[in-house]
């Protein structure tokens, strides 16, 4: 049995590391280079180009990579917990709960720092995900499609509540900017907490 298990793991690892993975890595590397070279400021001919490159371009690119890795890790963990391939943060209401947490943090603490906003968004996303799992325990799952449908419905309710609160507090425009997901304003000193994602990814890979 040990030999069979080892052989199965070797075949699985062989399927993971094939030419498709190489193409994907090359494409991602190309996009990273494109992100580093994209911007209004001329980093090659302008004064202080290297400083601007270190302050804005590198942090922006790293923030993009780490945010994407965070979404991927969330999707992986959710799929492992629910044993459903259709489950991800956008189909479970997690992103909507994060938006609600961010909005409530800004309303309660107008001058909140970026760290405080992140903590509020993460806490709300965690609570919302737990509520989603509680819903699943009370729903008869006749099909694998029921799980994302429940999540999308829950997310729609949370999104409507968030929009209502934003409208009442005159923060609807800010809410639209947040949900646009723009990384253009990311600078050094604003993204370092995202390195926690790399540690979590390493822990999941080891386990």
PLM regions and their residue ranges:
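Alpha-helical transmembrane segments in inner-membrane proteins
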Residues: 2-207
């Amino acid at each position: 049995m040990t030999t069979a298990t080892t052989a199965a793991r070797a075949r699985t690892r062989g399927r993971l590391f094939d030419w498709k993975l190489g193409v994907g890595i090359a494409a991602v590397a190309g996009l990273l280079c494109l992100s580093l070279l994209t911007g209004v400021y001329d980093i090659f001919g302008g004064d202080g180009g290297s400083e601007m490159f270190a302050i804005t371009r590198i942090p922006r690119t790293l923030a993009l990579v780490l945010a994407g890795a965070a979404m991927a890790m969330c999707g992986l963990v959710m799929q492992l917990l629910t044993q459903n391939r259709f489950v991800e943060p956008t189909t479970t209401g997690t992103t909507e709960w994060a938006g609600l947490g961010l909005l409530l943090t800004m309303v309660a603490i107008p001058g909140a720092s970026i760290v405080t906003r992140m903590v509020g968004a993460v806490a709300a996303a965690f609570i919302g995900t737990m509520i989603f799992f509680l819903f699943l325990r009370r729903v008869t799952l006749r099909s694998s499609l029921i799980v994302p449908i429940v999540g999308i419905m829950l997310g729609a309710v949370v999104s409507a509540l968030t929009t209502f609160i934003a409208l009442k507090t005159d923060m609807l425009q800010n809410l639209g900017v947040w949900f646009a997901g723009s990384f253009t304003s990311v600078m050094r000193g604003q993204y370092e907490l995202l390195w926690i994602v790399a540690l979590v990814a390493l822990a999941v890979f080891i386990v």
